[in-house]
């Protein structure tokens, strides 16, 4: 699947819950529905699950990305959409594209050129109940959990130049280490 969104540093996606405790009214598992209508948040979900599925292991998201800037970031949240409609984040990962190949040798994007990107969402163990949906949110910000970035090669928290990035991507795969109940 291919989608496009625009990231604007002056209007970052707000952090809703999660594993940070400072500066947030709510932390821990918080419903993500308030951010789903944003044009810079893309939401994918499965059909309702006919049986429970347990996911246990390390979660990675493989994307093919492009941008009209030399750097941008991706944030992905693996969530459960409950039968009630609540969307709860189970694990989250983020990566500034500059570091997609190496932390020690940053490499800019070539504007308009496709590049593979793997987002590590970390280890998790959870059971998605029958009737729920596996869902995925993709965006470029999660403030204040991660610092907004300028879409340039500048150091974090440096905003001498700010570029709005238009970012197409294709979701290649989200391999889930799953146990499907029979």
Question: Which residues fall in each region the model found?
Answer:
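C-terminal, loop-rich substrate-recognition/catalytic regions characterized by aromatic stacking residues
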Residues: 1-182
């Amino acid at each position: 699947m291919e989608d496009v969104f625009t990231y604007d540093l002056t209007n970052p996606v707000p952090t809703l819950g999660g594993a940070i405790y400072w500066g947030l009214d709510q932390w821990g598992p918080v419903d993500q529905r308030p951010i789903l209508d944003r044009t810079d948040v893309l939401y994918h979900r499965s059909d309702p699950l006919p049986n429970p599925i347990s996911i246990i292991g390390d979660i990675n998201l493989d994307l093919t990305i492009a941008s009209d800037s030399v750097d941008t970031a991706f944030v992905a949240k693996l969530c459960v959409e409950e039968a009630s409609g609540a969307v709860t984040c189970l694990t989250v990962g983020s990566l500034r594209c500059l570091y997609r190949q190496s932390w020690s040798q940053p490499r800019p994007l070539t504007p308009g050129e496709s590049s593979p990107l793997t987002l590590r969402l970390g280890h998790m163990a959870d059971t998605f109940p029958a009737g729920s949906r596996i869902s995925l949110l993709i965006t470029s910000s999660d403030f204040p959990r991660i610092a907004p970035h300028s879409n340039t090669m500048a150091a974090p928290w440096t905003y001498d130049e700010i570029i709005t990035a238009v970012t197409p991507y294709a979701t290649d795969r989200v391999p889930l280490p799953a146990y499907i109940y029979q």
